């Protein structure tokens, strides 16, 4: 203590004789980041924080984009637990993965998306790399476009689109444009507006498409509408960039959910594709995803793969191991794959059932509004058509939390609270 005290005295004497030293130290301590402003809170995380502070026993969080069981609890798929047990029993090492990820995972992901009998797979004219979930796949794809897509910097997003699409592409150096997608009057797909806008997009531009379970609206084109969109894309020579975060989770059928992607490829449109296993395997925190580029031939695919690895290396060197092992085990083990497909269908069916129950309960409440769009929409999210002031009332009067645009996560609705939700919605809309 004596030494510490004497040290302080000496430093104080030094500062007295050399006041510039104290001023310099003070400047160094406070001047580097004074210009940095407080960033805005994430709108969805903000909903969750407000929900946590609420003490109402009937409170509902319909903002979170994660599946919940019918008790409102996080759900780990039994097939995932089995895969984890099998992996643990093998006593595997924890060595780095290659830059492109776990080979057996990448192969299985491409097969899941494109179909096991895909001509693209048989000819080898594709490359798939493992990514840090769907967000990582989008960023890798966006960075590849920024570096090698020499025709345009414009990426056309549906209006609306997932909130993270804009910063991902913007931060990669691309420019964002939009095309009509959602019709607020019908709470459905604005097919006429979408086709009209896409047909006017400058040739050799990038068009982002949600493969299934459009986020945030839950509104998807029908197969015949997808066909017409593909025709326009081919005619305008647009590059189709697919985001497929919900394969299997939308309809309960993985092949049905991948129909649009496969149709585009069958029409001779070489696409790129982002996949995520957060929703359909419940591997949210494992960050498991894939990015696939369909190429002209196998030689082009090899060159694209080499450049994707060059992009990945300075970003994160190589992807995480554990989640990819789990996904690969499920996709490549017949009994686990069969079980997983049944579980995915079970999750999708529960969400479809909650949509039906919500509409039924709204009718029981005496609501005269047309709520058919709730059952017409698909996937985890539903655009209710509620106005911001109605959303505010739901929060203040009923402790029901959602984003201001009226989007709800149907996964947060259970057989135990759907009646309360219907009552609250009726009260703010009657």
Curated annotation (Swiss-Prot):
Q: Which InterPro entries match?
A: Aminotransferase_I/II_large (IPR004839), Asp_trans (IPR000796), NHTrfase_class1_PyrdxlP-BS (IPR004838), PyrdxlP-dep_Trfase (IPR015424), PyrdxlP-dep_Trfase_major (IPR015421), PyrdxlP-dep_Trfase_small (IPR015422)
The UniProt record lists the keyword Lyase: no
Residues bearing the modification N6-(pyridoxal phosphate)lysine:
279
Q: Which residues bind substrate?
A: 65, 162, 215, 407
GO BP terms: 2-oxoglutarate metabolic process; aspartate catabolic process; aspartate metabolic process; biosynthetic process; glutamate metabolic process; lipid transport
Q: Which residues carry this modification: Asymmetric dimethylarginine?
A: 313
> 3'-nitrotyrosine is carried by which residues?
96
Q: Per its UniProt record, what Pfam families does this chain match?
A: Aminotran_1_2
One Gene Ontology cellular component: plasma membrane
Q: Which residues carry this modification: N6-acetyllysine?
A: 59, 73, 82, 90, 107, 122, 159, 185, 234, 279, 296, 302, 309, 338, 345, 363-364, 387, 396, 404
Q: Which residues carry this modification: Phosphoserine?
A: 143
Q: Which residues carry this modification: N6-succinyllysine?
A: 73, 90, 107, 122, 159, 185, 227, 296, 309, 338, 363, 396, 404
E.C. number:
2.6.1.1, 2.6.1.7
Look up keyword Mitochondrion and say if it applies: yes
Q: Which CDD domains match?
A: AAT_like
The task this protein performs is described as: Catalyzes the irreversible transamination of the L-tryptophan metabolite L-kynurenine to form kynurenic acid (KA). As a member of the malate-aspartate shuttle, it has a key role in the intracellular NAD(H) redox balance. Is important for metabolite exchange between mitochondria and cytosol, and for amino acid metabolism. Facilitates cellular uptake of long-chain free fatty acids.
| Miscellaneous comment in the UniProt entry for this protein | In eukaryotes there are cytoplasmic, mitochondrial and chloroplastic isozymes.
Q: What is this protein called?
A: Aspartate aminotransferase, mitochondrial
Q: Which organism is it from?
A: Macaca fascicularis
Q: Which gene encodes it?
A: GOT2
């Amino acid at each position: 203590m004596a030494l510490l005290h004497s040290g302080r005295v000496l430093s104080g004497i030094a500062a007295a004789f050399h006041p510039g030293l104290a001023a310099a130290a003070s400047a160094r301590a406070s001047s580097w980041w004074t210009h940095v402003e407080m960033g805005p809170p994430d709108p969805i995380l903000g909903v969750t924080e407000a929900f946590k502070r609420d003490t109402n026993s009937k409170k509902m969080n319909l903002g979170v984009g994660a599946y919940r069981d019918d008790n409102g609890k996080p759900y780990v798929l039994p097939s995932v637990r089995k895969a984890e047990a099998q992996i643990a029993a093998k006593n595997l090492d924890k060595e780095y993965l290659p830059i492109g990820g776990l080979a057996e995972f990448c192969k299985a992901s491409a097969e899941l998306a494109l179909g096991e009998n895909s001509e693209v797979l048989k000819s080898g004219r594709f490359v798939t790399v493992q990514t840090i979930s769907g967000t990582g796949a989008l960023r890798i794809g966006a960075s590849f476009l920024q570096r090698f897509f020499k025709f345009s910097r414009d990426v056309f997003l549906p209006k609306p689109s997932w909130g993270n699409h804009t910063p991902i592409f913007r931060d990669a150096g691309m420019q964002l444009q939009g095309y009509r997608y959602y019709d607020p009057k019908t709470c459905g797909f604005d097919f006429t507006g979408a086709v009209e806008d896409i047909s006017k997009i400058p040739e050799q531009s990038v068009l982002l498409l949600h493969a299934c379970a459009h986020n945030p609206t839950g509104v998807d084109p029908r197969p015949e509408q997808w066909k017409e969109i593909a025709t326009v894309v081919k005619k305008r020579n647009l590059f189709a960039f697919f985001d497929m975060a919900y394969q299997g989770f939308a309809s309960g059928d993985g092949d049905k959910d991948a129909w649009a992607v496969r149709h585009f490829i069958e029409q001779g449109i070489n696409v790129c594709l982002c996949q995520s296993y957060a929703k359909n395997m419940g591997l949210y925190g494992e960050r498991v995803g894939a990015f696939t580029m369909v190429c002209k031939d196998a030689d082009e695919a090899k060159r694209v793969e080499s450049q994707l690895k060059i992009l990945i290396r300075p970003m994160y060197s190589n992807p995480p191991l554990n989640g990819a092992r789990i996904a690969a085990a499920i996709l490549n083990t017949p009994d686990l794959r069969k079980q997983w497909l049944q579980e995915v269908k079970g999750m999708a069916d529960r969400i479809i059932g909650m949509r039906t129950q919500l509409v039924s309960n709204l009718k029981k409440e005496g609501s005269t509004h047309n709520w058919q769009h709730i059952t017409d929409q698909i996937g985890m999210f539903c655009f209710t058509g509620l106005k911001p002031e109605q959303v505010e009332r739901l929060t203040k009067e009923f402790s029901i939390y959602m984003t201001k645009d009226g989007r709800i996560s149907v996964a947060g609705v259970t057989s135990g609270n759907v009646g309360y939700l219907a009552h609250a919605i009726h009260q703010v809309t009657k």
